[in-house]
């Protein structure tokens, strides 16, 4: 933040000096003013550190950040900002302007640059020359068509979007996949048959790739021209052609020069590592291959968000993103396929009632009976709902005569009066909890998927009567708590009335399909997967994951680095880990 402010102030200082003198800024004056500005900045920083002013500034940072953002965005540099650059007189020399502007073409920030660097360090200089050469020629040809306004080529090519982008992804995929299986041996000859493919692929990708940095830096130029594509307009056609050809020649010469510079720099870095470290050549080659492979793959995927695929598919049909005509279709973020139909005979309506609120168009932290928006602290749905349904996760030890179970029940707020599980008095006894306990006592260890229809036919009438009596007692004796009732009525038991047999059946069905078993009587156990049953299959799956470079890299970054940075006092002992596991099961 302070760096942006210093740069803006420095530009204003140079602009003020230029306006005051009325003449082009001389080189000596530029250096003296720059040194004076740097000394003033250093003096200000030292005074702030010694006077402890930085403590006050840090405390006021939440207030200052919006004001700083507004000042940076709101204050545009004056017109004289572009005048002092004319001291170099680059605007009159298109060759030098093109040469310097080509530095942005050679920045190694695109997928093709990473692939070419990989070929340089693994397969040698000839392979890198052909790779970089095809990319540079493709860029220069594209820029020439833009500068000269060759509409017969540019307009039809751009109207093919996104087909040309998809073609670029296909070409990049072929190159990246081939990198995975290519030999890392150095190619010393200049007439290898692979070089032709290297050149052609890079030439085509220069017209298709969207991951290069120069598209997004087109307004950065060392000359007075507003963009890198700004031409040199003259009334004389011959002079105009000469200037444009000179500018393109400067682009070509600069691209080759800066590319050779980057190649020389990477080769020097490789030589330095070989001489001054204990790494062998094959280790460096393997590391470079992995880094370039991941970088090229990352940049290729990074271009995907620039295209909305739902719009690409329905755009030609006349639709727009977030169109109401696309609601409840596969093109909406809230689309969900219908659930299984095995239990649909119990209900007239679908049993899966899921509320999906996509983050781009949902309303959050509200519920139907209130209009004002509540804070996150007031609506902790997950924790509150887990506390409401905690009775379903009790094990037999909690409800039996075991000493540990009684202590745990007392700590959680349950006071056991009798030996029966159904006679527990809950801290907040509600209609839903009573009904769940009633079902729990009847269907403890039965698989509801096979027997729920027969059970409902025989027990529904008595259950409805008992629940109605319990409901009247609940409404008459207990206080109303909207915070907890919100979960019964809005999330889990919405529009449920115990006076209607049809809705009672819906209630039982919706309650029973929430888990694999109806109200399990033990702690949540770790599910057995295929790898635990068949050890050979599990070992093979683990080996496949461990062979994946992306998986191992993410695992190292996410877990190993995090644990390595933790202080020793933050590590858990054996007793603490055991206690944490018990609390998680609760």
Swiss-Prot record:
Location within or outside the cell: Plastid membrane
Family designation: Belongs to the ycf78 family.
Transmembrane segments: 95-115, 129-151, 155-177, 198-217, 247-267, 284-304
This protein's record includes keyword Hydrolase: no
GO cellular component: plastid membrane
Keywords: Membrane, Plastid, Transmembrane, Transmembrane helix
Entry keyword Cell wall biogenesis/degradation: no
Native species: Prototheca wickerhamii
Domain of life: Eukaryota
Membrane topology field: Multi-pass membrane protein
Stated name of the protein: Uncharacterized membrane protein ycf78
